[in-house]
Amino acid sequence: MSRYVFTSESVTEGHPDKICDQVSDAVLDALLAQDPASRVACETVVNTGLCMITGEVTSKAKVDFIHLVRDVIKEIGYSGARAGGFDANSCAVLVALDQQSPDIAQGVNEADDHAGDPLDLVGAGDQGIMFGYACNETPELMPLPISLAHRLARQLAEVRHNGTLDYLLPDGKTQVSVVYENDQPVAIDTILISTQHTAEVGGMSDEQGIRERITEDLWTHVVEPATADLNLKPSREGTKYLVNPTGKFVVGGPQGDAGLTGRKIIVDTYGGYARHGGGAFSGKDPTKVDRSAAYAARFVAKALVASGLAGRAEVQLSYAIGVAKPVSILVESFGTGTVSNEDLTALVQEHFDLRPGAIIENFGLRNLPQARGGRFYQNTAAYGHFGRNDLNLPWEDVAAKAEELRKA
């Protein structure tokens, strides 16, 4: 019997890197909502008293970027007396956006391998490799460690926003270690939560008293609600439980650490449980296969698991810049497939159109911000891009495709 412990982490929306992801995707949403053909590659950096957006944009949209950035920062919670050194109302906002390179644009605008099919006209925006993954550990077909870490991070933010724990501040991280036996989760080994808080908590200012209060509050208001519906639950007796191990966490957010778009790619995906091609998502329009093809790879992997063809599935796609068809497609089922990996790969090639133009059209990726009231991608920029039952994501809706695969 094989026994091991696997760990994944998540971060809250107030983490410096996640602020940047949300700002970059808010810029993307604003541009696509006005002009669905916008080409966007937006990077954000934050530090004490500063937020800068930079990158390349080609769009007919007219956006007040400074106002937009301030709104995102304020919504996250960095404003007013508790903002520290990073206040939405007073931080400097710098905008340094250029137009997309014409050398890149020509390959995306007209693919090298087009042959009359309109979907062949959209080439990949860059070369690269993308991975998608799914497994049967959770109802959303995600690995349990990252699923739990996201649950805790979202609940941590919720009790801050709704005032249940009014001493909490926006920055925070969660980490969950799960015990596996024969590749199946059997216990929750460790829960770690680091959360920013005010200098005084409940009238207390001593570090030990504050830490004990936060530890108890988080178990009651974060851990228990976040895991209430799970069959595999943590317990105070059997689960190691760590809160703010350094003792206190008062200085946080961009005042404590600089942030940058695209530095939480493992949090965004599968928590390290599956491989990653290296490309980040946020701030990139759908012609960037780093994003759209990673969504498609998840769709394929989830459909394979949902269909019963595999208990675990990892899908690798690769692309060449300016070429529509994938360079390669590979499926790995880790011995859980009802047929061989070669047969699974052949099924994918037959039943999924993985050209960038087809991915964009099938998921409606250019039109989603407009269709969802001006905001779509920003909602994916915190708490994961996959397994999100709260966001109605098109790449998570695999019921029809799974049925198609069952009949194949």
Curated annotation (Swiss-Prot):
Residues bound to ATP: H15, D171, G172, K173, K248, F249, D257, R263, K264, A280, K284
Highest taxon in the source lineage: Bacteria
Which residues take part in binding K(+)? E43
Cofactor remark: Binds 2 divalent ions per subunit. Binds 1 potassium ion per subunit.
Q: Which reaction does it catalyse?
A: L-methionine + ATP + H2O = S-adenosyl-L-methionine + phosphate + diphosphate
List required co-factors. Answer: Mg(2+); K(+)
Q: In which pathway does it act?
A: Amino-acid biosynthesis; S-adenosyl-L-methionine biosynthesis; S-adenosyl-L-methionine from L-methionine: step 1/1
Tagged with keyword Iron: no
Q: GO terms for biological process?
A: one-carbon metabolic process; S-adenosylmethionine biosynthetic process
Primary location = cytoplasm
InterPro entries tied to this protein: ADOMET_SYNTHASE_CS, S-AdoMet_synt_C, S-AdoMet_synt_central, S-AdoMet_synt_N, S-AdoMet_synthetase, S-AdoMet_synthetase_sfam
Query: Where do the segments described as Flexible loop lie?
Result: 100-110
Which family is annotated?
Belongs to the AdoMet synthase family.
So what does this one do? Catalyzes the formation of S-adenosylmethionine (AdoMet) from methionine and ATP. The overall synthetic reaction is composed of two sequential steps, AdoMet formation and the subsequent tripolyphosphate hydrolysis which occurs prior to release of AdoMet from the enzyme.
Subunit structure of this chain's protein: Homotetramer; dimer of dimers.
* This protein's name: S-adenosylmethionine synthase
Its ancestry begins with: Bacteria, Bacillati, Cyanobacteriota, Cyanophyceae, Synechococcales
